[in-house]
């Protein structure tokens, strides 16, 4: 992904904004599921869904049992709405792509109910490094 400066201000019709969020969420039962093919699949799915909603992925890492994302979400969209949409759509797409997963996850619930979110502010570089070093 191309590097973007930390202090870039985006704009909408009558708004200037710089909203960045560190978001972490995990599969149901914190299962270690993201290896090889499923790791690549969820990465592509999350990129696709973010693109649909105009959300920029600044940094991201798919760990075996959770996902870290540093996102730039426009202020016209609430964080809770977007995370719900992201988890819901990605869940459906994972079950569609990997049909055998429905036996491991009852009621087709792929993700845990909650998530972690933190506003990033001026320490974007530190959060980017933290996410990039998750697998070390």
Could you describe each region identified by the protein language model?
Residues 1-136:
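Basic nucleic-acid-binding interfaces
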């Amino acid at each position: 992904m191309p590097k973007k400066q930390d202090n870039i201000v985006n704009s909408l019709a009558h708004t200037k904004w710089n909203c960045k969020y560190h978001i972490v969420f995990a599969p149901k039962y914190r299962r270690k599921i993201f290896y090889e093919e499923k790791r690549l699949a969820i990465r592509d799915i999350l990129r696709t869904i973010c693109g649909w909603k105009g959300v920029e992925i600044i940094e991201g890492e798919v760990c075996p049992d959770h996902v870290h994302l540093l996102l730039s979400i426009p202020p016209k969209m609430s964080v809770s709405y977007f995370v719900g949409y992201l988890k819901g759509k990605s869940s459906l797409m994972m079950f569609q792509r990997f049909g055998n997963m429905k036996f491991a996850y009852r009621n087709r619930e792929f993700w845990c109910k909650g998530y972690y979110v933190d506003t990033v502010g001026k320490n974007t570089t530190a959060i980017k490094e933290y996410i990039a070093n998750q697998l070390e």
